[in-house]
Amino acid sequence: LMSSTPRPRPDALTTALPVPAVVVDSGLSHLDREFEYAVPARLDAAAQPGVRVKVRFAGRDLDGFVVARRAEARHAGRLTPLRRVVSEEPVLTPELVATARAVADRYAGVLGDVLRLAVPKRHAAAEKALAMAPPVQASLPPPGGPGPSAAWAAYPAGPAFLRRLAEGEHPAAALLALPGQPPERDWPALVAEAARVALDAGRGVLVVVPDHRDLDRVDRALVHALGPQRHVRLTAAPGPPARYTAWLK
């Protein structure tokens, strides 16, 4: 006997860059590579590089990240369509993928495990609230003091270090901060001034400190040097919503 129930028709697939490369969070080291899928036409606009997706993998629905969209598949067989786009927010940049890949290779790890630790879990309410918030146009305050290297003038190589940052170079340096300095010349102020020089040169800055006490000091120094809402604090203490909001900013 033949069933009279018609089979559901498969989704039409997009024709523009129809092959997404997906890093699947399988947790298995022998599957530590990209997998190719197909993009249904209804997901074409949303399934962009950097977004979270759900994919069918070995009979299960697993999480993944789209890391690229390609015109042609490298896999010779039939491609499985993406199940859905979890969020249209691109949380994974090519630079972050490359860094996570380097960390995984360096320590014999799995890319999916590194990304799970590097990218905070999605918080839908925080994502929605940030999307509805008006954009903040914050500009750098005018520099104070005799010049951008004022706090660094006490260090023989300080002005040269800042100059190389301003010129787009990547100088390596170790700073032994002088003790007993006033706040405007203490090490948090030096870090904040170096960050400002890098930002003036159109670059990003990541400052890592060992504990919350140092975090508070650097936070105050950055507000003084850069103005409000020019940087974010990333810690585990505020909880998932605040951490995810800071990540998206």
Predicted feature descriptions by range:
Residues 1-249:
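Accessory, non-ATPase domains that flank or precede helicase/AAA+ motor cores in DNA-metabolism machines
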